[in-house]
Amino acid sequence: MSEKSKGIIIFASNTDKIDYLEIAARCASLVRHTLKLPVTLITDDEQYQNSVFDNIVRIAALDNTNTKYYNNTTWAWRNKSRYLAYELSPYDTTILLDADYLALTDNLLKLLDTHFDYLIVKDSYNTQEVLTQPMARGSINFLWATVVVFNKTQITKNLFELVARIENRYSYYCAMFNIFNQSYRNDYAFAIADLIINGYHLDNNKRIPWSMFTFDSDIKNMERLNESLIIRTDKNAHIIPVQDIHIMDKLYLLSDSYKNFLEEYINAA
């Protein structure tokens, strides 16, 4: 039996304010270093080229109507069509990553040789609190679709088909699950699809077995000091062990400061 192919998929579509393709390229340069896996970009940009990606798959143009609120500002957010990951992935085992996820370790590799249909992040925390919460009052907790690891099985195929159905009928599912903010979120769609797939039972066997660290404040700079990371904001400095991080500050991910951090991090090994 031939060895299963393994790789990473990143979706990225630019908006008028954020160059998500550049964020994805920086993410790819990091994961090629830490995970040493091929990386496929899925984008609706018809002309974008970058050799950091092993493969670029182009999809139909995404609408620009979805929004998110961060740092007292409403941003356009083109996060739809994630359900295409199953169909378009060229790999037997896929790590589906958001471009703002910094894989600073090789921890995700530990999941690839285990037996599973799919695994999703259940819990996330920041420097002060656990971020896991219900989608709405009286509803289920959402999952973090920031990282989804999956094998090509019938159950996984069913999951992504359900995500597609939920995206296309999002208002209906929002009403069903008591969600009042109807701005589309993959975190919600995957949580609902996961619940339905598992017979309306929560199956913790389909969870990534550790919590995700999310930094949800604006960042001034980051620095690695031996086995620690120093994350500086305008007011504070946070010292944490080296670990994977979900970064919410997209402007920092586009900054020269972050570019320099990546170059130093990659070249230090």
What do the PLM-derived regions correspond to, one by one?
Residues 36-44, 95, 119-121:
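Short, hydrophobic beta-strand segments that form beta-sheet elements in well-ordered domains
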Residues 58, 78-128:
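GT-A fold catalytic core of metal-dependent nucleotide-sugar glycosyltransferases
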Residues 26, 30-37:
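Short, acidic, metal-binding catalytic loop of nucleotide-sugar glycosyltransferases
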Residues 1-11, 21, 41, 51-52, ...:
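A glycosyltransferase accessory/donor-loop signature
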Residues 48-89:
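Active-site-proximal specificity loops/subdomain of glycosyltransferases
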Residues 46-54, 109-114:
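Short loop/helix-cap segments at secondary-structure boundaries that form the rim of catalytic
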Residues 120-142:
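Class I SAM-dependent methyltransferase SAM-binding "motif I" and its flanking Rossmann-like core
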Residues 42-48, 61-62, 103-105, 124-125, ...:
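Short, polar loop motifs at secondary-structure junctions
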